[in-house]
């Protein structure tokens, strides 16, 4: 089982590469991370981007950390992205992603991605406009695979989200999305499945279960996001948390049964910005240890030696 951490917990706290790299290795005992663009904005001037990316890459190498991929983060998710109602908005998102791929390659990642965008209510409710947004999205992703390949990346990862105005948001839509991209992409397009999204009961119902996603998407899945959740919100809590109900060990068994043990899983906890730093550090540490034990199957001795 390949387990690592998304660097979302470092945002607005341990932003210096030399500091978070040391923390990940020494405090958390991990050597696999997913970088977030909340730490390095692709819109920054090229000189600043290059300088910061070089620091990130050097820090990761110094501390023996693999940056498996770079992900969009919270800031970019606030915008409508590649599904913006205005053509100029969609073009701006396209440019953002192209810059993001350059950043991903510069920090040493082999993949990049995230949620692709969200339709406005008006576009979503109009069948003709909804179909046009979908067609535009396919064109955009195909173009982005060319840019990602040129940057040196090996694949793009699209995150499935629990909103009907975003694409893709169901297993069947994910399957159709990938089918519609066949023969159009310069590099593979994979899916990232977040357990808190896939098990969101207000959208998918009380019987939502992970095997539906694992068996339905199979090798199309390029990564997982782990979080603790009550299944009523996209919670992104850690462990222990009395509100959380997610069984990490059970999920590990489901992943093994689906034959997806080699797919990396990243713990993604999103903390309130105002939460005390020492509280965040304690929480991310106990959460990582919980997942190392329950998901990765590490023994207490192995965790102490790491």
Ranges and model annotations:
Residues 34-35, 67-72, 109-116, 153-159, ...:
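Short beta-strand segments at enzyme active-site cores
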Residues 44-64:
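Aromatic-lined substrate-binding rim segments of carbohydrate-active enzymes
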Residues 3, 66-68, 85:
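Mobile, glycine- and charge-enriched loop segments
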Residues 31-42:
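A short beta-strand-loop structural module common to alpha/beta enzyme folds
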